Amino acid sequence: MSLAVSLGGCASGLPSLSSIKNPFKKAEEKLPGERIPVILDQASDSVDPSAAAKPISLPPPATNASWTEPGGSASNSLGHLALGDRVNKVWRVDVGTGSSSSGRLSAIPLVADGKVYTLDAGGTVAAFSAASGAKQWSTSLTPKNEKGVEGFGGGLSLDTGRLYATTGYGTVVGINPESGAVLWTQKVGEPVRSSPTASGGKIYFVSSDSVLHCLDGADGQEQWTARGVPEPATLLSNVSPAVGKGLVVAAFPAGDIVAYNIGNGEAAWRESLSRTSETSAAGILADPARPVIEGGVVYAVGHGGKMIAVSESTGERLWTRNLTSTQMPWVAGDTVYVVDITGKLMALAKGDGKVRWLTQLPGTARWNGPVLAGGKLWLVSADGSLVGVDARNGQVSSTTSLGTKVFVSPVVAGGRMYILADNATLIALN
């Protein structure tokens, strides 16, 4: 974000060339007719009457026993989860090192087998009782001779009885989820600020040099790599791939979404989330959000100003919207929910992307989410607010103060919500 600000500030205080009058310039003749802007601004989004007229159909809520990937599942899609109408704080616990000037806490907690797993900004993995918050174990992943300040970023995933962690130290670690014992460590040569997705005994993640890696979950041996377009300036957003039917879909900092064959890493199709005609400062950094695979369709959005729906198997574009977001879309029933960088929460028709309803969330702080549970869309904000929004009509039905900043989306498992605050406080709510 600082890059966009600094570029915008270069000309402050100087007159623009267009403001200097040319005495020899002839008056321009304006042609008749309606003038339609070529570049659609984020503010031009509005509710489509035909889409709004159709009632939103939510699938019945289902209780998920676990949340094993950063996006909930390997496809980053969980549908409609079970949760009570109101949430109340049950317990809170300190999980380690929070955000600081050295790095941000960005790893989403996981839930499985009665435990909540966290990775703090210092590179320490810990497990806590989901029932009480009591610590079960903790393991530092900081290599010897490291200062301990480069381990921020990375994330966790669970698959085939193993817990996997990526770290800013450029390592991937296999861990026993019951004891915290390290099973193996694999060096990848570059820091890994993003989270992994584990599926079918394989681990997929993107390192800071825009390389997608596939490792064997049993021993950490590299199976294949695929290089994306390097991007020197990024938002350091923490995303993870989506795994579907024979393909893994990865998001790269330059704004590219690429589908690869999970067997050999060959690219099947490629899409860009950057608006080529974008002139706003926000479009300079194109970091995408976590992609979602649902019903044979890939949904993706990014900071470059574009949201797309494409066929998972062929990459055929189904629809496009001009929309700027760093948050993973949530797909359920016939609707896709997404919040943009200005705090507009939208319900889009899954078939064509038309806006069914739009709600401006309160305040000016950044919002993270949504997660659909108990008929509501749940989001947390950088100023410490938790809101519940009716998924059918967009009305804000509940607001809770968490008392601390939050930059990580909520997690729901076993009918309980878990929120990891920026100061490394884990909060459980029923």
Task: Name the predicted role of every residue range.
Residues 6-9:
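C-terminal motif of bacterial Sec signal peptides marking the signal peptidase cleavage site
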Residues 11-14:
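Bacterial signal peptide processing site
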Residues 29-47, 54-90:
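Blade/loop signatures of beta-propeller domains
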Residues 91-110, 138-157, 183-199, 222-244, ...:
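Extracytoplasmic beta-rich repeat domains
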Residues 120, 167, 207-208, 252-253, ...:
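Structural signature of WD-repeat beta-propellers
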Residues 126, 173, 213, 258, ...:
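WD40 beta-propeller blade core
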Residues 129-132, 176-179, 216-220, 262-265, ...:
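Short loop/turn segments that connect beta-strands within beta-propeller blades
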